[in-house]
Amino acid sequence: NRYAVVFTKIVDVTLENAKLAWLKLHEPENWKKTALFSTMQDYFLKQFGADDYYTDYSSASREGMMDVDNECWSKEMHDILGIDLSKRAKIVKEPGKVVGHIGKEVSEKSGLPVGTPICMGAHDQNCCTFGAGAVDDGTAVLVMGTFGSCFVVSDKSIRDPKERLVVKGNHGCGNFTIEAFSNTAASSYRWYRDTFCDYEKLMAKEQGEDPYDLINKQIATSPIGANGITFLSFLQGAGGARINGKARGTFVGMTLGTRKADMARAVMEGICYEMYDIIRAEEDSGIKIDKIRLAGGAAKSPLWCQMMADIFKHPIQILENGEAGCLGAALYAGVGVGAYKDCHEAAKVDRTTKEYTPNPDNYAAYDAAYKRFCDVYDALDKKIF
C-alpha cells in the first residue's frame, strides 16, 4: 500500500525498479561497476551534447523510483536497492529546458547545425498528451495504436484504492496525468487482419484500397454485440484495469453461423471494452472526464470512433494532427527556446477536426456486450488463466 501511495505505481515487472532488482541479483559484477543508472533517452541526450545526464519529470515519475508528490528521487526506494542518488540523472522539471547544444562532431554525423539547442522532451505518452492539447483538468487523451493508453489530466494526485492506475507528473503543466495501459489495443486488429484476411489484403491491393477499409465494411454488417461473439483482446496479457500477465486472447460464442464480419466486429469491440475498463477505473476513482481526444490509427476509422463514443458514453474528438506525440515533443522544444511563453500557450496550437457524439440508442446493447466481456474474463480467470 505504501508503494502505491508514494510511488503512485502499479506493481509491474516492466518498470525500472523491477529491472534494477533483477540486474542486482543476476549480474552482481556489472552492478558493482555501474557508475550511473540511466534510461536510454537520458543516454541519447548526453551523446547528442547535453552537458550532463538529465531526465524529465514525466519519465522519472513512471518508473517506481520517484516520490511523485514531492517531485524528487525517492531515497527510500534507492536505499532498498542500494543505489546512491549521486548515480542518477538530474530530474528536469522545466518544460523544454535547453540542456546543451549540438557540437561539430554530432553535426557531421547527424546533419544538425552546430549550435542547435538540445531541449528536454518528456515521456512519449506525455508528449502525446501535450500534443493533443491536454493541459487542463478533465481532458482525457486516448491513444489507440500498437499500444493503448488513456491519460486524464487532473489537478489532484489521485490514488486508485484498487491500485489499477498510474499517477505521473504532467510535465510542464503544473498538474498530473492519471493513466493506465492496454498491452495490445490496435495491435489486436492488425493481428486479425494478418491472420484471417489474406483475401481482403489481395482485393485491397487490386482496388488500390486499404485492407482495413474493406474489413470495416464487413464489420458494419454485423450488429452490436457481434451476434454473440466475445473477443478478449489480451494477446500480450491483460493490462489496463486488470493487470494479468497470464491472461490470453480468446474468441467465445462461435457457431456454424458465425461470419468473418462477426469475428472482426468482436475484435474491434473487445479492444474498446478493454479501454472502457480503464475509463471506468479512472471515473470510479473520482477523476472527472469532460472530453476524450483520440490519437493513433483507430482515429482513421469513423466506424471505430463512433463505437468508442457509444461504449464510453463520451464525445470523441479527432485531432487535426494525427502525430500528437511528435507535435508534443516539438511544442516542448518551442517552450524551451522561447517560441511560446509556457505550455498553456503552446497547447493552443492543437486543433480538433471532428467530434463523434454518443448515441444513447446504442447504450443498452453495448452495455450487455460489455457485461458478457467481463463475465467471460472472470470465468476464464478462475479456471484457465
Regions found by a protein language model. Give the residues of each.
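N-terminal low-complexity or amphipathic/hydrophobic leaders
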Residues: 56-59
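A conserved helix-loop-beta module that forms one wall/lid of the active-site cleft
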Residues: 82-94
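Active-site core segments that coordinate phosphate-bearing ligands/cofactors
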Residues: 1-10, 14-54, 64-84, 98-100, ...
